[in-house]
Amino acid sequence: MSLSSKDKATVKLFWGRMSGKAELIGADALSRMLAVYPQTKTYFSHWKSLSPGSPDVKKHGKTIMMGIGDAVTKMDDLERGLLTLSELHAFKLRVDPTNFKLLSLNILVVMAIMFPDDFTPMAHLAVDKLFCGRALALAEKYR
């Protein structure tokens, strides 16, 4: 699913509105993913605590959202723009690419909760397209 120029503008506008709360969104979305999809906890077994609000969850939630912010700036070529991140997840972290979609779903839920007026159907569609493209780009090195 490719992003149209209208989709890109919508993503940039929405990101501009919500980026101030990106850290909170990331922590909440990661907490939700770990609770709803407990199999994802295996990637974080080295953390002291997987509880919502734990320092590790907050820190990684922030890292995730910084990565998404980076993807927003690289929407024109996600595959090339996220190549280093794809290599990291494929070869070092060995994350099952299915988890990119699971996390995306949880981020969408949190965005909808935190920004009910801004997260319109058009914003939802555009951000979901970005997340689909991001998941494909991150899975590139798995092929």
Curated annotation (Swiss-Prot):
Q: Which Gene3D superfamilies match?
A: Globins
Q: What else is known?
A: Hb 3 displays a Bohr effect, which is enhanced by organophosphates, and a Root effect, which is enhanced by ATP.
State the name under which the record lists this protein: Hemoglobin subunit alpha-1
Q: Which gene encodes it?
A: hba1
Keywords, A to Z, come to: Acetylation, Heme, Iron, Metal-binding, Oxygen transport, Transport
Which Pfam families does its entry note? Globin
Q: What CDD domains does the record point to?
A: Hb-alpha-like (cd08927)
Q: Where is the Globin domain?
A: 2-143
Organism equals Gadus morhua
- Chaperone: is it a keyword of this entry? no
One GO cellular component term? haptoglobin-hemoglobin complex
